[in-house]
Amino acid sequence: QHGIEIMFDMVFNHTSTTHEWFRKALAGDKEYQDYYIIRDPKEDGSLPTNWSSKFGGEAWAPFGDTGKYYLHLFDVTQADLNWRNPKVREELQKVVNFWLEKGIKGFRFDVLNLIGKDVALVDSEGSNEKSLYTDRPIVHEYIRELNQASFGTLEDIITVGEMSSTTVENGILYSNPDRNELSMIFSFHHLKVDYKDGEKWTDQPFDFLELKRILNEWQAGMSDGNGWNALFWNNHDQPRANSRFGDPERYPFETASMLAQTIHLLRGTPYIYQGEEIGMTNPDYDDISSYRDIESHNAYRELKLAGLTHQEAMRIIKQKSRDNSRTPMQWDSSRHAGF
């Protein structure tokens, strides 16, 4: 009636460890064991690789009592899928087609550029770990295959890929219409300008000049290569932009207006996250028990182990926690509920 369509968030890099496929794999079904990335330990009994989980700790967990390990780049309850298995890709194509038949008009694919793990997984050396599983060349083949088997058969479907640590060059490949991959991509470099030496869980003011440089690099580069940006400040994994990049205490209207104008006047498609339209800010919880985000709890524990006081650790958690964007609408008992 109002011309509003629905976009679904598709998590195709991993499944829950309570998923039917993983349960069958644990029960000994070898067909479903090949749906996941399961490896023997090294000869010395150590983990298959020295990779780290993005949520802290190791990226491998015991696969039942088999003596093997399964890969989880994220939480231990999120087992990475083996996209090199054609059956896995066919299953995921069916999922997309199921929702297309229901009338869904858009898909946001979670961490899609991480699906191309190599057959032979090797240890990382220094800072090269992400390159071992990010933007591997075969990812483009997988996306084109998914495109041609599902959403690419229709003309009015929007797709956006969440691309972790990608490059402008790959962003163009993912989103140039001639490539038959995706409509656009989310990149996150502009949201790392308050990371110290690339580390998220640090107390670091954002670098305005670096932010400006990154926005310009992606605007110019994607335009030159006929790629397409998804423009955003906020999502379910980020702190509130008003608190992060502005001064919502003294200049709430100016802060929200400045940030909105930035993404609405650039080349690309703007995305608005719930609460952004009313200028929501970070909550101000003083205790880690008020947070539910597993990444925040892991970070708090590691910060304390590194010697920080509770107050110092909480200052960082307050700034960087994903729960900043996951709180309810901030209303009160005043006129118009405070809006």
Regions found by a protein language model. Give the residues of each.
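Active-site and adjacent substrate-binding regions of carbohydrate-active enzymes
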Residues: 1-339
